[in-house]
Amino acid sequence: MRFDVAIVALKLTTKRTPLASARIALDLMDEGVIDAATALERTAELQEEDLGTLRLASQDTPGTQVEPLGQGIPASPGVVSGEIALDGQRAAARAGVGTSVVLVRQDAQTSDISALELALGLLTQRGARTAHAAVVARQLGKVCLVGCESLRIDLSARTVQIETMLLHEGDVITLDGNEGAVYSGAVAAVMVPDEVLLERLQALRTSQAVAPAHRKHGK
């Protein structure tokens, strides 16, 4: 089942990460949907230190190497760790007590949008980077891997199998949305600034700081 476009449009007016908010505002400005003043207003409170992508920490130190359980298609970048949640009810219950969760589904459905907002990431067995689930994840700034063909979900047993590894709902996994890898447990990550996005944002702020002076001078 695919996401309903109207519902997606409604849901995407809710919470986004700073990185997603900046990217969306700048893209809309570049496409002519909003003007520069509106883009500036929408990004005014964003801090540069928040505009980055998490990547796996260096594993050069002996003994720190970790091997992925499986591979999927990287659909939205970043690195997140959280408990496996197999449905929206579980995601809401665990997120409600402050626990980080990763939503794991065969294929995302319309009813999963609310759960995706609560989760840090999404892992699906089916789908492609252009699937609605992936688009929604990118708009919300959620890490997303789709098309993980080695993923098997047993809802009756509340278990997940990736290759030969059997995991239970509540076990912690890490999604690497940059490389499309799934890991068992929590894997250390570091924030890497999005230099291209920062340059675009700085150019916007500089141009809008100069514009009022030009208008004043022209009066």
What are these regions (language model features)?
Residues 1-63, 168, 179-200:
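Terminal amphipathic helices with adjacent charged low-complexity linkers/tails
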Residues 10-11, 16-17, 67-68, 105-106, ...:
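Short secondary-structure boundary micro-motifs
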Residues 15, 22, 68, 72, ...:
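Generic hydrophobic-segment detector
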Residues 31-33, 37-97, 101-109, 122:
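Long, charge-dense accessory insertions within large macromolecular proteins
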Residues 78-91, 95-100, 106-219:
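Acidic, glycine-rich flexible loop/linker segments
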